[in-house]
A protein has these predicted regions:
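Solvent-exposed edge beta-strands and adjacent loop segments
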Residues: 1-77, 121-138
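Mixed-charge, glycine-accented linear interaction segment located at domain edges/termini
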Residues: 119-161
């Protein structure tokens, strides 16, 4: 896209300005720059932050809500494309039917405008491996759900330094 991340960037960001990449091979992909980018035929990778809370009632204060945690979820969906490294991995039998640590992978999610984002581990939860109507492109959907709290990521210092 010919965009160079800049710590001084100010302005609008588009959905296309965000990169989601996962590590699919620990032996060959030792740096984030070698991880597989989620892009080809992907229509959406929407991020959401799902907070956990508890409510307690106190005398004279009333109900108080305490935030106890936050889980990052990236909802990915698009058209099926056999041969795309991201789709081939997330739609593999191992991931579709896997459980526990077998479906947990390192990920990075950041803005190409600022270079800032997050990195951590996430569970890959395939919610649809083939969808669509007659004569329409086949579709897929997968949720990328962070395990624990991701770390802050800065492309300018973590990758290019």
């Amino acid at each position: 896209k010919d965009i160079e991340p800049s710590a001084d960037y100010a302005g609008e960001e588009n959905t296309d300005d965000f990169i989601l990449a996962i590590q699919t091979d620990k032996t060959k992909q030792t740096k984030e720059s070698a991880w597989i980018v989620c892009a080809d035929h992907v229509k959406e990778h929407s991020g959401s932050l799902n907070a956990s809370t508890t409510d307690e009632a106190f005398i004279r204060t009333g109900t108080v809500t305490t935030k106890t945690g936050t889980q990052r979820t990236l909802a990915v969906n698009g058209n099926r494309c056999v041969g795309d490294a991201f789709q081939d991995f997330v739609l593999s039998h191992k991931i579709k039917y896997g459980t526990g640590k077998d479906v947990i992978v390192p990920y990075v999610y950041f803005s190409v405008r600022t270079g800032k984002g997050e990195t951590g581990n996430a569970s890959l939860v395939v919610t649809s491996d083939v969808g669509g109507s007659a004569n329409a492109p086949a579709t897929f959907a997968v949720d990328v759900k962070a395990v624990g709290t991701p770390k802050a990521f800065d492309y300018l210092t973590d990758v290019t330094a």
